[in-house]
Amino acid sequence: MSVTLALPSKGRLKEKTLAVLEKAGYKVVLPDDDRNYRARVEGEDDLDILFLSASEIARELGYGSVDLGVTGEDLVRETLAHADERVAIEAQLGFGHADVVVAVPEVWRDVTTMADLDDVAADFRQRHGRRLRIATKYWRLTQQFFSQKHGIQVYRIVESLGATEGAPAAGSADMIVDITSTGSTLRANRLKVLEDGIIRRSQACLVSARRSHTSRRVEEIAARIRAGLEI
């Protein structure tokens, strides 16, 4: 029975993932046609490669339709409810580092912590006649962090379909929850990260579907990739 390994379909994530696999002894033979999203591995007839977007990989792992995948831990936690029951993080791969953060306008000088933000949220409706609006693509992580961890209840999530960091300046939101690696884009949009506003530190990970844990082949592949990281 073959094992399906889902990999990022483009960009630096794809390049770095292929390098990690080659270091572990898995040389991926790319298709001649860029529109072909399947590939093979030299000498591994029972290992199928499937190229997907990072968010699709997280979803398919949750469904159990792929056995292993490389994606960001932020996407795993955001995409899958009860993620630990459905998937397992096999290895952190050491690239694709980014943080999911709470960021507010720099002009909110008195707001530096989540406790300050709680006060703002409680006061916002009385002052403005509406709830505090948070633009984000990470609604699950936002709800968990605001409501469950910090007890902040009076806010409204605004789905971000474009560049989240531009939402406050555009007037479609008051603040944001977004992913950042250097913080330069946030600073360019005059936003600041709250002192205790890091929701999750993320990086590219090798992830397995729980339903595949009975497969010795899946365990073998994961172990070989982990060993390759230590070379």
Swiss-Prot record:
InterPro entries (UniProt xref): ATP_PRibTrfase_cat, ATP_PRibTrfase_CS, ATP_PRibTrfase_HisG, ATP_PRibTrfase_HisG_short
Location in the cell: Cytoplasm
Record bears the keyword Nuclease: no
A single GO cellular-component term on record: cytoplasm
Entry keywords, A to Z: Amino-acid biosynthesis, ATP-binding, Cytoplasm, Glycosyltransferase, Histidine biosynthesis, Nucleotide-binding, Transferase
UniProt-listed Enzyme Commission number(s): 2.4.2.17
Biological role stated in the UniProt entry: Catalyzes the condensation of ATP and 5-phosphoribose 1-diphosphate to form N'-(5'-phosphoribosyl)-ATP (PR-ATP). Has a crucial role in the pathway because the rate of histidine biosynthesis seems to be controlled primarily by regulation of HisG enzymatic activity.
Entry domain remark: Lacks the C-terminal regulatory region which is replaced by HisZ.
Identification of the protein by name: ATP phosphoribosyltransferase
The species this protein was found in: Brucella ovis (strain ATCC 25840 / 63/290 / NCTC 10512)
Lineage, top ranks: Bacteria, Pseudomonadati, Pseudomonadota, Alphaproteobacteria, Hyphomicrobiales
Gene: hisG
